[in-house]
Amino acid sequence: MGQKINPLGFRLGTTQGHHSLWFTQAKNYSEGLQEDQQIRNCIKNYVQKNTKISSGVEGIARIEIQKRIDLIQVIIFMGFPKPLLENQPRGIEELQTNLQKKCNSVNRKFNIAITKIAKPYGNPNILAEYIAGQLKNRVSFRKAMKKAIELTEQANTKGIQVQIAGRIDGKEIARVEWIRRGRVPLQTIRAKIDYCSYTVRTIYGVLGIKIWIFIDEE
């Protein structure tokens, strides 16, 4: 039953850390969560509009948010930050202004930092975006999956499982196709597994992409 639970939540506190660090009163908790979601959506939309990468991948691995009384620190982990950093500091200033307008935070300042991750294709979010781009360009799903696995092998991962569900190749009946390389021990809590669930809209309908990457064992 290891696949039934979210692998990130299952390992929280052992091999996985929190992506949002802040505390508030219980009555304001839902507002804080909504604000986090707004910040993440705003950053993703900005990156989508302002970066044109040949592979069609935005390259955001994760966004970490730390909140203090007068400051919101946002760290964007990216696989390909070059297009965004070329506009620096104008690009980051523009993003800070957008976030302040979106969140109506007059009393709080935004501090945005961009960090490049060493092996972009060892991250499931970037890999899922790559597969989504291939599927939109009508590349065969098997070819897209195999190419994605080849890219992760270059990142020295110990195992990967890719699953695509929906009306694959425009077939009438929805089905689930998956492929696995190496070990993916979903039951082992000390196994560091990175996971991503991604939705892609194609001309035939919506497809769901799930990726599990086994990085290391602690």
From Swiss-Prot:
PANTHER family: 30S/40S RIBOSOMAL PROTEIN S3, SMALL RIBOSOMAL SUBUNIT PROTEIN US3C. It is found in: Plastid, Chloroplast. Keywords: Chloroplast, Plastid, Ribonucleoprotein, Ribosomal protein, RNA-binding, rRNA-binding. One of its GO terms (cellular component) is chloroplast. CDD domains: KH-II_30S_S3. Part of the 30S ribosomal subunit. It comes from Coffea arabica. InterPro entries: KH_dom-like_a/b, KH_sf_prok-type, Ribosomal_S3_C_sf, Ribosomal_uS3_bac-typ, Ribosomal_uS3_C, Ribosomal_uS3_CS. Gene3D superfamilies: 3.30.300.20, Ribosomal protein S3, C-terminal domain. This is Small ribosomal subunit protein uS3c. Residues 43-118 form the KH type-2 domain. One of its GO terms (biological process) is translation. One of its GO terms (molecular function) is structural constituent of ribosome. Belongs to the universal ribosomal protein uS3 family.
